[in-house]
Amino acid sequence: MTLIDLQGRRVLVTQADVFMGPALCRVLSSLGAEVVADTRDLATDAHAAEAMVADAGPVDVLLAHLAVPAPNTRVDDVGDDEWRRVFAHLVDPLPRLARAVVPAMRRRGHGKILVVGSASALRGMRRTSTYSAARGAQLAWVQAVGVELARERIQVNAIAQNFVDNPTYFPPSVQVDPAFQQRLQCEVPLGRLVSADEDARFAAYLCSDAADCFVGQVFPVSGGWAWR
């Protein structure tokens, strides 16, 4: 018997071609899940989430994996366009996805929603006010919806990550920079990036029956950079 068993589970992964998507799909598949990897844009089409779920068919797990490059803007230079664009990518899809998947999960009497978020919502970072606010909204949504749906056997949780190896936020050109390596040693107790597989295996655990007891939880995965 293995702790993480996803045999017979259908998992829908959004934005599966960027950020943690490839690693998540690979690890979930290796643990027996039937992975539906979707790559459509959820930010610009308000009906994309509904169409995505309709195309996927019944899903046991929604992995709400949303990413956008983080603006590096001084707070007094943040414009409305930047604010709206980041929230459109990271926050607006969540209620649309919930409307699309929750009714069927409720009818079946079980389901899971896992949001892949950011630890930037847990610890302040300079010049990231827009991005951190949007990531914080994701986590607040998870906590509220997790409590709302718990009695219906639908678990809603989040990973809040930073310093995890991925091509969107830590491409190879960043990782080889001596200044970045020095930053790792100074800021991250682990002293290295969390590997993509380490992160994906933890996500897989949260998608499994072994994690049925977690309700609206936010789990930092950041090598100790953030812990609350």
What are the roles of these predicted feature ranges?
Residues 103, 147-151, 212:
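Alpha-helical segment proximal to the catalytic Tyr-Lys
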